[in-house]
């Protein structure tokens, strides 16, 4: 079994800038994705950690984002669906990140500065090399 721990800050991620803005931390699972009418849709769930007012403001701000199709939260737990236009670059990144051979050892942590920490494993080193290539 091969493992990889990386820290990234994705420019297309709708959560990163907001965690930095509201100084909250997300424990995040990207549950699934699908494609429809030239768009990529992402389904995610997670736990929001921080001061109550900041967590609420984070969710209210996120709900205003035009990319967000659905957002529901109860206390700290949330489920979200958001979309973005499909491009070749994003389609390739999605193919790599949603590889069914990847095992997420823990939730992706998006910290108060907007950085994501991923810890993943695979029986094939090449899978992790592809994940690592997403950083560049």
Q: Language-model features: where?
A:
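DNA-contacting interfaces and partner/effector-binding or oligomerization modules
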Residues: 2-134
């Amino acid at each position: 079994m091969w493992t990889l721990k990386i820290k990234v800050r994705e420019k297309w991620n709708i959560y990163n800038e907001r965690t930095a803005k509201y100084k909250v931390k997300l424990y995040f699972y990207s549950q699934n994705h699908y494609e429809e009418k030239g768009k990529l849709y992402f389904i995610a769930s997670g736990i929001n950690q921080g001061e109550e007012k900041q967590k609420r403001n984070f969710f209210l701000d996120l709900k205003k984002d035009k990319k967000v199709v659905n957002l529901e939260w109860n206390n700290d737990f949330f489920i979200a669906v958001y979309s973005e236009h499909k491009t070749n670059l994003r389609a390739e990144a999605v193919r790599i990140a949603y590889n069914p051979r990847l095992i997420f050892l823990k939730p992706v942590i998006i910290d108060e500065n907007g950085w994501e920490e991923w810890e993943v494993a695979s029986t094939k080193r090449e899978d992790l090399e592809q994940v690592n290539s997403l950083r560049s």
